Amino acid sequence: MNARPEKASSAGQADAPIRSGADYIESLRGRGLRVFLQGEFVTEPVDHPVIRPSINAVAETYDLAVRNPELATAVSPYTGERVNRFLHIAGSPGDLVMQNKMQRRLGQLTGTCFQRCVGMDAFNALHSVTWEIDAARGTGYHRRFIDFLAMAQRRNLVVGGAMTDASAPTERSAG
């Protein structure tokens, strides 16, 4: 459980949705994180020149949704509202085509990784897997997943994921 108090967004409410790239950037400030980069403590990660390009790329995912909602948003069956396509569960081949077009456009705009694809893919996988587990075992994972998804959609959060390579050399130390 996170012991830190939740930071209010620029709208002044902790649960207010992030509406733009500027809102996203502001939501990252003043979190009191202990960040070290190349052995040096970073006082405010948002302003660090090595970190900032990644932040700007994520911010563009919000701004594209504002500028081009047909491309970068979709109507959620869980909230009934338009949500960022990175938080949308693909329900048709058309959804997958639009995901690809959005990702292509973001690549053109940012020229870099925009940090949200793995989270989107994880959400889509979890949607299917939790339903299958519930069907086989009578558990409540899918409902809890849908509740979390709807909360993330309402607040327009970034959901991140990580890829690892299990075949990477393990004989070397991390240090």
Region annotations inferred by a language model:
Residues 57-75:
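Short, solvent-exposed cationic patches
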Residues 3-62:
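N-terminal-proximal low-complexity accessory segments that begin disordered
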Residues 74-175:
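Glycine-rich flavin
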